[in-house]
C-alpha cells in the first residue's frame, strides 16, 4: 500500500464498503459521542469521517489528536446507518473504522479558526494565509481561479491565438500609474521597471509578423488599492490581433468572454448579445462609463422643463450658463416622502446640498406631483416631466443640475443608490456590454494642459485629419471597454501604428518627436518598418473571477495578496535590505524628512 494514502478524502463510496484503505489529511474536527471518537479527516479533495471506539487499536492515538493535526489513518470502510448518512458530503454514506492512526505532524494552537469560517480580522488572515487557505470558501475560490484561467487558455487556443511570454524587466513607461522600479547593479544609476502591461511588447509582436497573441500576463502598478484593484500586481488576459477593425475584435472576443461566464456562472443568465453603448451615451444615461445594466434606471435631460420655471435654483443656473443641464433620475415605486427624504439625506452625506425630487400619488381620480419642486414649477411642467420619464402613481423622480462634467458621477451614484434601495437590481445575472467611442483627449485641470483620456497608443478616429482640424476634446478614439455588473472587466483599442500620426498625437499633449523616440523608442522604430493595422484588449482576470465566485473583494480570490496598505504580512514585504545589497546597487538611503 502507498506510504500515505490509497484514496483521497473525497473518493470513497458505498461500493467501497469492506475495503481496507489508507487516508491522510488534516483533522478538521473531533467529536466525542459517548466515548466513541468521530474525526472528520480533510484533504484538498474533501472530507471522510473516521470512527475510533475504545476497542480499536487506534483509539489511544485518536484521543490525542487535535484540530489541524496531520494524520495517516488505516481502516475498514463501513456503511453508515440510515440516520447517520450525511447527504451534504459525497462520502456521506460511509465511514472508516480506524485500525491504525499515525501522527504525521502536530499543530500549535491556531491563531484563526479553519472550521466554520467565522469572520476574522483580515490582517490575521493574511499573516497566516497558509491557514486561511485551508478554509472551504477560500480554497474553493482559488480552485475556481485555476479552472477559469485554464478555460481562458483553452478558448483562446481553440480560436487560433498563440501564447507568448513577454519580459518582466523592461523600461519605465508613462501608462497612467507609477512604475515599480528595479535598480540596475551593472548600469549604475539606471533602472528597470516592472511592466504595467505588456502593451508595447504585444504591439511589437504584431510588427514582427505574428498574427494572434495572448498571454496570462502579470502586471505591476504602484497605485493605491481599492476593493476592485489589488495593490502591487494583478493578472490580465492580454491579447493582440493583426489586420483587424474594432468590430472584429469584439466579434472575436465576445464568444470567449460569454463562454467563460456561462461555464462558471452556475446557471445564472449571461448576456447573449453584448450591447454597444457610446461613452457619451453611457455618461448621460447611467452617469458612469462602467454602468451596472442590471439596474433598469435610465436618466434623461429635462432642462427645458426647468428653464424659466418657478424653481429659481435651477432656473437661474440655466439662465446664467447655456451649458447647464438638469438630469432626471426616475425611481419606480420610490414615491414615498420617507424614501425621498432618505435619498436627500444620503446626498447631503456625500457632500451635496441635497437631492431635489417629485413623487406622484393619486388624489381621487387625479395623479398629482408632490414635493417642493412640483409646487414651484407648477402642474403643467410636473406633468410634462412625468410623461417624458414614463412615471405613474407611487413613482418618484430625483434631479441634479449644473455642468454635466461636474455632476455626472454624483448622478450615477444616485442612480445606483436608488436602484439598490428599491431592490430594482437583479443580482442573479451577468449583464455585459461594450462601451465604445471614448474621448481621445481630456483636459487636465490641475496642470492646465491637454492629456490622453485613456490609452496613448490608441488610434484617433479620423486619423491625421482629426488631429489637424478638429477640436482635440471632440476627437474620439478607437477605444473600448467591456463592462459587467458595474465593473470594467476589459479594455482595448485599435492601435496607432502610423509614425506621423503617433508623433502628432503626442505633440498635442506637449511631447515632441524626440520625447516620443526617447520614451517609446522600440515601438517608434518598429513602426518605421511596416506595421500592420492591429488592435486588441486585456481582460482583468482578477475582476472576472471575483464576479464569477461572488467574492466581496479581490483578496478573496488571490493566493497571497497584500493588505490595503500594500504590505505582505506573510512574507514581511517590503523589508529592509543589507548595506551590502544597497552598495552593490549604488544606492544610499537619505533620511526621511518628517513634516
Swiss-Prot record:
ATP binds at residues 221-223, 488, 540-543. GO terms for molecular function: aspartate-tRNA ligase activity; aspartate-tRNA(Asn) ligase activity; ATP binding; nucleic acid binding. The record marks 33 as: Important for tRNA non-discrimination. It is an enzyme of class 6 (ligase). It catalyses: tRNA(Asx) + L-aspartate + ATP = L-aspartyl-tRNA(Asx) + AMP + diphosphate. It is found in: Cytoplasm. Homodimer. Aspartyl-tRNA synthetase with relaxed tRNA specificity since it is able to aspartylate not only its cognate tRNA(Asp) but also tRNA(Asn). Reaction proceeds in two steps: L-aspartate is first activated by ATP to form Asp-AMP and then transferred to the acceptor end of tRNA(Asp/Asn). This is Aspartate--tRNA(Asp/Asn) ligase.
Amino acid at each position: 500500500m502507498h506510504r500515505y494514502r490509497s484514496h483521497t478524502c473525497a473518493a470513497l463510496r458505498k461500493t467501497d464498503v469492506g475495503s481496507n484503505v489508507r487516508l491522510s489529511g488534516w483533522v478538521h474536527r473531533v467529536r466525542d459521542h459517548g466515548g466513541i471518537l468521530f474525526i472528520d479527516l480533510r484533504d484538498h479533495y474533501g472530507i471522510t469521517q473516521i470512527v475510533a471506539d475504545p476497542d480499536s487499536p487506534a483509539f489511544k492515538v485518536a484521543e490525542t489528536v487535535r484540530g489541524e493535526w496531520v494524520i495517516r489513518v488505516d481502516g475498514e470502510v463501513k456503511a453508515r446507518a440510515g440516520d447517520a448518512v450525511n447527504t451534504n458530503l459525497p462520502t456521506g454514506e460511509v465511514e472508516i473504522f480506524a485500525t491504525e492512526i499515525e501522527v504525521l505532524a502536530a499543530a500549535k494552537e491556531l491563531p484563526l479558526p479553519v472550521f466554520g469560517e467565522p469572520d476574522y480580522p483580515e490582517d490575521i488572515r493574511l499573516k497566516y494565509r497558509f491557514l486561511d487557505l485551508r478554509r472551504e470558501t477560500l480554497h474553493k475560490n482559488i480552485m475556481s481561479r485555476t479552472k477559469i484561467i485554464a478555460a481562458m487558455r483553452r478558448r483562446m487556443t481553440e480560436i487560433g491565438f498563440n501564447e507568448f511570454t513577454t519580459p518582466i524587466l523592461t523600461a519605465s513607461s508613462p501608462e497612467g500609474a507609477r512604475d515599480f522600479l528595479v535598480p540596475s547593479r551593472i548600469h549604475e544609476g539606471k533602472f528597470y521597471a516592472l511592466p504595467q502591461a505588456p502593451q508595447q511588447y504585444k504591439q511589437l509582436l504584431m510588427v514582427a509578423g505574428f498574427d494572434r497573441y495572448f498571454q496570462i500576463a502579470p502586471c505591476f502598478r504602484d497605485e493605491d488599492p481599492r476593493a476592485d484593484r489589488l495593490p502591487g500586481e494583478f493578472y490580465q488576459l492580454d491579447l493582440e490581433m493583426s489586420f483587424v477593425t474594432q468590430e472584429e475584435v469584439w466579434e472575436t472576443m465576445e464568444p470567449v468572454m460569454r463562454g467563460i461566464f456561462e461555464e462558471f456562472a452556475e446557471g445564472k443568465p449571461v448576456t447573449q448579445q453584448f450591447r454597444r453603448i457610446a461613452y457619451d451615451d453611457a455618461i448621460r444615461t447611467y452617469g458612469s462609463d462602467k454602468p451596472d445594466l442590471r439596474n433598469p434606471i435610465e436618466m434623461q435631460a429635462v432642462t427645458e422643463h426647468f428653464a424659466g420655471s418657478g424653481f429659481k435654483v435651477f432656473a437661474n443656473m440655466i439662465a446664467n450658463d447655456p451649458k447647464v443641464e438638469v438630469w432626471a433620475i426616475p425611481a419606480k415605486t420610490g414615491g414615498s416622502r420617507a424614501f425621498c427624504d432618505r435619498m436627500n439625506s444620503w446626498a447631503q452625506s456625500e457632500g451635496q446640498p441635497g437631492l431635489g425630487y417629485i413623487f406622484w400619488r393619486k388624489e381621487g381620480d387625479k395623479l398629482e406631483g408632490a414635493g417642493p419642486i412640483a409646487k414651484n414649477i407648477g402642474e403643467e411642467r410636473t406633468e410634462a416631466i412625468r410623461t417624458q420619464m414614463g412615471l405613474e402613481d407611487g413613482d418618484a423622480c430625483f434631479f441634479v443640475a449644473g455642468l454635466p462634467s461636474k455632476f455626472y458621477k454624483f448622478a450615477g451614484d444616485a442612480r445606483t443608490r436608488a436602484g439598490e434601495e428599491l431592490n430594482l437590481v437583479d443580482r442573479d445575472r451577468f449583464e455585459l456590454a461594450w462601451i465604445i467611442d471614448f474621448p481621445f483627449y481630456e483636459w487636465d485641470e490641475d496642470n492646465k494642459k491637454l492629456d490622453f483620456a485613456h490609452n496613448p497608443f490608441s488610434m484617433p478616429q479620423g486619423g491625421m485629419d482629426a488631429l489637424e482640424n478638429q477640436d482635440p476634446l471632440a476627437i474620439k478614439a478607437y477605444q473600448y471597454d467591456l463592462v459587467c455588473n458595474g465593473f470594467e472587466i476589459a479594455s482595448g483599442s485599435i492601435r496607432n501604428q502610423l509614425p506621423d500620426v503617433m508623433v502628432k498625437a503626442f505633440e498635442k499633449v506637449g511631447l515632441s518627436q524626440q520625447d516620443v523616440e526617447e520614451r517609446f523608442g522600440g515601438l517608434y522604430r518598429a513602426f518605421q518598418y511596416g506595421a500592420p493595422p492591429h488592435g486588441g484588449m486585456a481582460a482583468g482576470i482578477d475582476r472576472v473571477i471575483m464576479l464569477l465566485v461572488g467574492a466581496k473583494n479581490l483578496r478573496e480570490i488571490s493566493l497571497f495578496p497584500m493588505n490595503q496598505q500594500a504590505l505582505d504580512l506573510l512574507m514581511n514585504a517590503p523589508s529592509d535590505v543589507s548595506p551590502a545589497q544597497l552598495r552593490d546597487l549604488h544606492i544610499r538611503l537619505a533620511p526621511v524628512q518628517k513634516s
